[in-house]
């Protein structure tokens, strides 16, 4: 069942996604998240962030981009970070700790 979801981008996400994906590729991801908001894998140690694969260019999802997002409520998703898999495999412990602080702030704002 579809329902309305508000997507909010961090400034970091906006900068990163512009470098790696087209508007249509981003729209395709947002449609996937509307269909299944909890689609991404939970990232341990981040306070609830999820990581999802995103197809970009002529690459499939497996070797393409990664998007980190936070499902704050059933109808609000924060888009936090994005990167090409070829440039980064996963988050470092320091990044996870910083992102956990962010998720705590976002939870407090609900």
Regions found by a protein language model. Give the residues of each.
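Arg/Lys-rich, positively charged N-terminal/basic patches that mediate binding to nucleic acids
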Residues: 1-24
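Amphipathic alpha-helical interface surfaces
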Residues: 9, 25-29, 64, 76, ...
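Compact soluble domain cores
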Residues: 12, 21-41
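Residues that form generic nucleotide/phosphate-binding pockets
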Residues: 16, 32, 102-105
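Basic/aromatic recognition patch in beta-strand/loop cores that engages polyanionic ligands
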Residues: 42-83, 87
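Enriched for short, Lys/Arg-rich terminal
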Residues: 70-110
């Amino acid at each position: 069942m579809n329902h309305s979801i508000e997507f909010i981008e961090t400034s970091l996400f906006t900068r990163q996604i512009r470098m790696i994906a087209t508007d249509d590729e981003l729209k395709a991801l947002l449609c996937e998240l509307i269909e299944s908001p909890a689609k991404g894998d939970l990232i341990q140690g981040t306070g609830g962030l999820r990581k999802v694969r995103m197809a970009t260019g002529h690459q499939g999802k497996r070797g393409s981009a990664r998007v980190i997002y936070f499902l704050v409520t059933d109808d609000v998703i924060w888009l936090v970070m994005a990167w090409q898999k070829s440039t980064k495999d996963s988050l470092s412990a320091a990044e996870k700790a910083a992102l956990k602080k962010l998720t705590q702030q976002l939870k407090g704002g609900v």
